[in-house]
Regions:
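A short hydrophobic/small-residue beta-strand
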Residues: 16-17, 105, 173
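Radical SAM enzyme [4Fe-4S]-AdoMet core and its adjacent flexible, acidic
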Residues: 26, 79, 99-101, 109-111, ...
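Conserved alpha-helical substructure of the radical SAM core
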Residues: 1-101
Length: 251
């Protein structure tokens, strides 16, 4: 079982898609440390195998009690993971402290293959550089890293280059998040049905080089099965493209 706790709305970024509509300062209605421990107690009561307990936000590093809570959850047998933002708080020292508290897995967001694309989406300059630096620091510490990429019109043509970054820097998983138009994301450009088919087929191809999964793209499993069957029948290349009715975005 997986439990995701949005521990705070506070975040230094201004991401264009943020469903939490994060703000620079913490909300007084956030769970206190005692309430957070109670939440972890409840999650731990679910039994074995231990729950994967993801602490996110906002930016989870905005909570000064983050390491304390991570250690508490780890002590209960929870598999505590973090999903921090690419800010100046994402340092090797901070990651090492969390690793000492029992955190061995983090997820980071990479929404462009270049600083220009990623930073424009995240609303703050240097976010791309900080994310790459945090990614490499986590890997140097021996932590496992999942890379999450929102898939929308702003970056769809950069997906192959993002895949190359995942391949070169190493990650346990690359997850493509098909844009959910909620929060600040209601006005962003979602892909249409034909374009989604093209993207999911591209993810299938890129999965030969990097470990790929999707979020809010449940039909990726259907595409994977179709492609597996076609490959078994020797249907590849242009014949596959025609059979799957793929469009210009895939090409």
């Amino acid at each position: 079982m997986l439990v995701t706790w949005e521990a705070t709305r506070a975040c230094a970024l201004a991401c264009r898609h943020c469903r939490a509509e994060a703000v620079p300062f913490r909300d007084p209605r956030e769970l206190s440390a005692a309430e957070a421990r109670g939440l972890m107690d409840e999650a731990a009561s679910f039994g074995k195998p231990g729950v994967i307990f993801i602490i996110t936000g906002g930016d989870c590093f905005e909570r000064p009690d983050l390491a304390e809570l991570a250690a508490y959850g780890s002590g209960l047998g929870l598999h505590v993971a973090l999903s921090p933002s690419g800010t100046d708080k994402l340092t090797k020292a901070a990651l090492a402290e969390l690793q000492d508290a029992g955190v061995n897995v983090i997820s980071l967001s990479l929404d462009g293959a270049t600083a220009a694309t990623h930073d424009a989406f995240r609303g703050i300059e240097k976010t791309f550089d900080r994310t790459i630096a945090g990614w490499r620091a986590a890997r140097e510490l021996g932590m496992r890293v999942q890379i999450n990429s929102v898939v929308a019109r702003h970056n769809v043509h950069e997906l192959p280059d993002i895949a190359a970054l995942v391949r070169d820097n190493g990650a346990m998983t690359w997850s493509g998040f098909l844009l959910v138009p909620t929060g600040r994301g209601v006005d962003l450009g979602s892909l249409d049905a034909r374009e989604v088919e093209d993207v999911l087929n591209a993810f299938y191809d890129m999965g030969e080089a990097v470990p790929v999964r999707t979020t809010e793209g449940h039909h990726f499993r259907r595409v994977s099965l179709q492609r597996h069957v076609l490959a078994g029948r020797g249907v590849t290349g242009e014949a596959m493209i025609e059979t799957m009715h793929l469009g210009t975005l895939y090409r």
